[in-house]
Curated annotation (Swiss-Prot):
The lineage of its organism: Eukaryota, Fungi, Dikarya, Ascomycota, Pezizomycotina. GO terms for biological process: ribosomal large subunit biogenesis; rRNA processing. This is Nucleolar protein 16. Residues 70-86 have a biased composition (Basic and acidic residues). Involved in the biogenesis of the 60S ribosomal subunit. It is found in: Nucleus, Nucleolus. Residues 93-102 have a biased composition (Low complexity). Residues 182-191, 230-241 have a biased composition (Basic residues).
Amino acid sequence: MGRVLQKKKNRSSTPKQRPKRTGQLKSGKKKINVLGNAIIAQNWDRKLTLTQNYRRLGLVHKLNAPTGGSEKKPTKDGRIEELPEDPLHIRSSAKASAKQAAMGETRVERDPETGKIIRVIRDEEEIEIAGRKVKPSNPLNDPLNELSEDEAARQPASQRTNAKSAVVQQLERQADQEGKAVKAKKPRHQSKREEEWIMRLIERHGENYSAMARDRKLNPMQQSEGDLKRRIRKWKANHSS
């Protein structure tokens, strides 16, 4: 004879074993398939961590700036090398963005109707060096400085993308091809049953679309008058020849 407690457990409706959580880690976070893309899976190194793989491939796994845990390599002098700030990182605190903005007066452009600020116009103020006023971006007052900036802006995109890794270029080409495929989506063709249904509506009501919309026998799904017009217009275009 079994024990009373064991018999109660057997009669209980609670499951004996908890169901496995599919697609979740032990911490409760959702498991992300980083190898979902064929190009990334082909160039992925399983011996490296996610951050190391993304850095090697030229990708970014987080847009936010790192809050800690990043390794800073010492230089030959023994000092800690300060990594340059990535302009793509999103500042998470309002204090950091307030420090970045310079205090002072500036011009703004407002909406004439609502009065809201559309954009801030920041003029590059001149600074005085050795008794001469020059721009901060051109302290030597070089006349060829503006020409070099214009040449850099006119530089073709193929030359500017040389710094990108081969994986990033492949991903960009793949995204471009997918975008073109979405734009070139084929139109929906009417089925034979839909064409027969439209013919029955026309035989009974002719051009009276409002009567078609109210017909509960031939239009049981209560398609609207405008929807019926579009379907019949498409049907006539296909059978006009």
